[in-house]
Curated annotation (Swiss-Prot):
A Pfam family this chain is assigned to: Proton_antipo_M
Protein name per its UniProtKB record: Putative antiporter subunit mnhD2
GO cellular component: plasma membrane
KW NADP (keyword) present: no
InterPro entries per record: CPA3_Na-H_Antiporter_D, NADH_UbQ_OxRdtase, ND/Mrp_TM
Listed transmembrane segments: 1-21, 31-51, 77-97, 107-127, 129-149, 160-180, 208-228, 239-259, 272-292, 307-327, 329-349, 367-387, 402-422, 449-469
Family membership: Belongs to the CPA3 antiporters (TC 2.A.63) subunit D family.
GO MF annotation, one: NADH dehydrogenase (ubiquinone) activity
Keywords: Antiport, Cell membrane, Ion transport, Membrane, Transmembrane, Transmembrane helix, Transport
Oligomeric form and interacting partners: May form a heterooligomeric complex that consists of seven subunits: mnhA2, mnhB2, mnhC2, mnhD2, mnhE2, mnhF2 and mnhG2.
Taxonomic path: Bacteria, Bacillati, Bacillota, Bacilli, Bacillales
Subcellular location as annotated: Cell membrane
Length: 499
């Protein structure tokens, strides 16, 4: 079973290489890429089910056991992220190819989407710091290509900000890796967890943890958000959905992994700072969603706002808070894909990004109104939608930790997030007569189909929350309880650690 853990990363990589030679064969590219991601999703879910019912699996490349060799770790946290990511990439590929454009393969876009997916999945699966950096770079290089492909001045400006800030974040990450290796002498997650446990009062470790905090915050748009709104606003629908679903979530995943398994010995410093940054991020996101009439920018700030929710749960440093953060992270990958599909469909049908031109649209497309309601309630955390279980657990974590300011901010900003989208929906149903003059294009059947799939999944994830919570609880216990991790992952390292 352990050998199968490489497949979720290997299959998209092989497919990406093949697509280089099928650039002008749109039908072959479409069938190959979508089929690959469907198979990838099925394999990932099968591995996740196995891990939840048994124990985490590891793969040591070249026969070199940790901490000396390259290792992949498949636990509930990593495989949950891989499964959800593979699923949304499948829909995003279908969305992109569904347009039926002859130039869909121009600039090898499907190839770079798959390479970005390789970097994302590799980041989830890797079990050592240096390879995490390598996977981040694969992901970022592919994203640099995707965000810079355009002919407008607006897109070029957004791309420059995106590239510069992410390069700075990568430098900080590499600096943190070097400092940690010099101090601790290992890069493997399991070995790091063991050694750091005996260095609780080391101020150097606390300083290093803050370097990682800033580095991952730049990836997750936690306070350091300047690159996100402009970059997402200029991308086409499938790329915006891809970035919203995955790019910031990899940074959030890294924060969860590092500040539960590794850097949890000085919560009065690290986790207090996480809570503070989460609160600032929620405030920034709340102002952003009500400040613009551009629906793409509203959606971009919704991404920032949700990162604040996730990190608030992590910062509580409680089982319930971290459990809620993991649940909400997985949920948000799906919900943000749905949100950007909805926003992209609005722009497609109306031809405008300003919501004032959407008057009467919902009357022409009743199903679209239903999809919009689902995404609003999911973002707001209204039961029985998928955002509810995660937010309840984050609430519990905040109360347990005595973080009433963060709790109040989460409630208020959740209402603001819903208001910003209800405002758009109100125009869609009850807008003034000027909007009626817009000639709306009908929504293609394939887009309705993809929206339907996401709507069903969002509803199912809320209704079947106990099933998902079993996975997230397992992930939380494994990463927050050191004895559980050591009993299940790389047990041979106990001998290495004492030599």
């Amino acid at each position: 079973m352990s050998n199968l853990i490489i497949l979720p990363m290997l299959l998209p990589f092989v497919c990406a290489l093949i697509l280089v030679f099928t650039k002008n064969k749109n039908r072959i590219s479409k069938i190959l890429s979508i089929t690959t991601m469907i198979v990838n999703t099925m394999i990932s879910i099968a591995l996740l089910i196995y891990v939840v019912n048994h124990k985490p699996i590891t793969l040591d490349f070249g026969g070199w056991k940790a901490p000396f060799g390259i290792q992949f770790l498949g636990d509930s946290l990593s495989l949950l992220m891989v499964s959800v990511s593979s699923f949304v990439v499948t829909l995003i590929m279908a969305y992109g190819f569904g347009r039926g454009e002859k130039r869909v393969n121009r600039f090898h876009l499907p190839t770079f989407i798959l390479l970005l997916t390789v970097g994302v999945i590799g980041s989830f699966l890797t079990s050592d710091l240096f390879n995490l950096y390598v996977m981040f770079e694969i992901m970022l290089l592919a994203s640099f290509v995707l965000v810079t492909l355009g002919q407008s001045v607006e897109q070029l400006r957004a791309a420059i900000v995106y590239v510069v800030l992410n390069i700075l974040g990568s430098w900080l990450l590499l600096l943190g890796i070097g400092m940690l290796y010099k101090t601790v002498g290992t890069l493997n997650f399991s070995h790091l967890a063991m050694r750091l446990n005996h260095m609780e009062n080391n101020q150097t470790i606390t300083m290093i943890s803050l370097v990682f905090l800033v580095a991952f915050s730049s990836k997750a748009a936690l306070v350091i958000f300047m690159w996100l709104p402009k970059a997402y606003a200029v991308l086409n629908t499938e790329l915006a959905a891809l970035f919203a679903a995955l790019m910031t979530k990899v940074g959030a995943y890294a924060l969860i992994r590092f500040f539960t398994l590794l850097f949890d010995h000085h919560p009065s410093v690290t986790h207090t700072l996480l809570v503070f940054m989460a609160c600032i991020t929620m405030i920034i996101g709340a102002f952003g969603v009500i400040a613009y009439k551009d629906i793409k920018k509203i959606a971009a700030y919704q991404v920032i706002l949700s990162i604040g929710f996730i990190i608030l749960g992590l910062g509580s440093h409680t089982i319930s808070g971290v459990n809620g953060a993991i649940f909400y992270l997985a949920n948000d990958i799906i919900v943000k894909t749905l949100l950007f599909f909805v926003i992209g469909s609005l722009v497609y049908m109306s031809g405008y990004r300003n919501y004032q031109y959407l008057s009467g649209l919902a009357k022409r497309e009743p199903f679209f109104g239903v999809a919009f309601v689902v995404v609003i309630f999911a973002i707001g955390g209204v039961p029985p939608f998928s955002g509810f279980p995660g937010k309840v657990l984050i609430f519990q974590g905040a109360i347990t930790n005595g973080n009433y300011i963060g709790l109040a901010l989460m409630i208020v900003t959740s209402l603001i997030a819903m208001y910003s989208l209800f405002r758009v929906m109100f125009i869609m149903y009850f807008g003034d007569a000027d909007g009626e003059q817009v000639q709306f294009r009908p929504l293609p059947i394939y887009r309705k189909g993809l929206l339907s799939v996401l709507v069903v999944v969002v509803l199912a994830m809320g209704i079947a929350a106990p099933v998902v919570l079993k996975v997230t609880e397992d992930a939380t216990n494994l990463n927050m309880k050191e004895d559980v991790f050591q009993k299940n992952v790389n047990t041979h390292l106990k001998e290495v650690n004492h030599k």
